Amino acid sequence: MRKLLNTLYVTTPEAYLSKDGLNVVISVQQEEVFRIPVINIEGIVTFGYMGASPGVMKLCSDNGISLTFLSPQGRFISRVQGATKGNVLLRKKQYQLSDDASWSLHVVRLMIGGKIQNYRNILRRYIRDYGENEDINRAVQVLERAKRDALKAQDKTELIGYEGMASNAYFEVLPILILNQKTDFPFHGRNRRPPKDAVNAMLSFAYTLIANDVAAALETVGLDPFVGFLHTLRPGRTSLALDMMEELRAYLGDRFILSLINKRQISVKDFLFQGDNGVVKTDKGKKTFITAWQARKREVIIHPYLNEKVEIGLLPYVQAMLMARYIRQDIDDYPVFLIK
């Protein structure tokens, strides 16, 4: 099993990345503030517009380290990656299957079905821990019906309809799962670009990080993150990463954010409310989020398909590996990640 190394998150917008030998150096206003050997990291995510030197880009490329640039608010800008990994036969098969409507529909049914079941399992866990709730029970029934229908969808348009129905039911009752700081963290449904409340700001931020991790994992196992089966092909869009993150959103993103709020690890003071420009995290809030995110990635679970201990941060890699095996026909079906 691949070892989970650290992802270096550079949250200071004024930071500039350069190299010194085999070290990544971070400077602010031309003063060095941090350095780390490349052998200790597997990825760099930087939030800001100062950029990085060509030397550090080459250093990352040569050592298989993904270098991702996000805006200070967490919106994806670009990614630097090295030579294509994996063998050409795997990618050729991936491209063929992407054009196979029947095969693509089958695999995206599984992904969306898994996403809906993970929504359901989060709600069922609340009932198990805190007792019956009429609104949550109704939402669970909608999710169970949506999953059954999704697994029988005749085309992708129909499938997306069931996914939308499930998401609406789930997010409608999500505020019930916020047990502490309810008045500080109101939630009235999913919104973005820009997010209008702190919960949506955290959801969008987490989903960006997940998509980045999945794209890097796909590249690692030799798949093309830009050619998917559900999300349409578009220049610059990592369609397969967006496909595969669907099953991971609830566990990696939603549960993490609920935990942050309920354990009071983050507060309303960690956000800036900018009216029509939406809500963003303060520098302190961003660091609080990232620190907790990194700690969460180091936690260990039993993978439901492999029945092996896996660090949570390796879940994107494990699912990418399983997708590669399925495309090569080494396994009979793609095992989506399902939480308990």
Would you name each region that the model predicts?
Residues V38-A52:
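Extracellular/luminal Protease-associated
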Residues V45-Y49, L70, A206:
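Short His-Asn-centered micro-motif
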Residues A52-P54, K58-N63, L67-R109, R120:
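Phosphate- and other anionic-substrate recognition elements at nucleic-acid/protein interfaces
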Residues E14, V33-F34, Y49, G55-M57:
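Catalytic micro-motifs at enzyme active sites that drive phosphoryl/nucleotidyl and oxygen chemistry
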Residues M1-K19, Q29, R35, N87-F226, ...:
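Active-site helix-to-loop segments that bind/position phosphate- or nucleotide-bearing substrates
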Residues V24-V25:
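Hydrophobic residues embedded in beta-strands of well-ordered beta-sheets
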Residues E42, P54, K58, T208:
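Short alpha-helical basic/polar micro-motif
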